């Protein structure tokens, strides 16, 4: 049977966990084997900019950070389960990637 690897990433971990819970509920309802959601390390993207644009005065900086949360779910990919997963409402802040394997 084919397996599907579902990779989810988002900057909002609450919405990401909500989508994972929906996929988990579908797997339990259809009775297929599932592994996950496996939390991957959170990537922190940092940008430091100088507050003063003219170069005069004291050096003060703004520090901006964006955290990217990732989850991986491995699931048996029968037709009925995948059809239900495709109908899940995904928020705009969540990116999803589905890869089918033999």
Swiss-Prot record:
SMART domains: Ribosomal_S10. One of its GO terms (cellular component) is small ribosomal subunit. Signal peptide: none annotated. Pfam families: Ribosomal_S10. The keyword Ribonucleoprotein applies. It comes from the Archaea. Keywords: Ribonucleoprotein, Ribosomal protein. One of its GO terms (biological process) is translation. One of its GO terms (molecular function) is structural constituent of ribosome. Involved in the binding of tRNA to the ribosomes. NCBIfam families: uS10_euk_arch. Part of the 30S ribosomal subunit. Belongs to the universal ribosomal protein uS10 family. This is Small ribosomal subunit protein uS10. It comes from Methanococcus maripaludis (strain C7 / ATCC BAA-1331). The lineage of its organism: Archaea, Methanobacteriati, Methanobacteriota, Methanomada group, Methanococci.
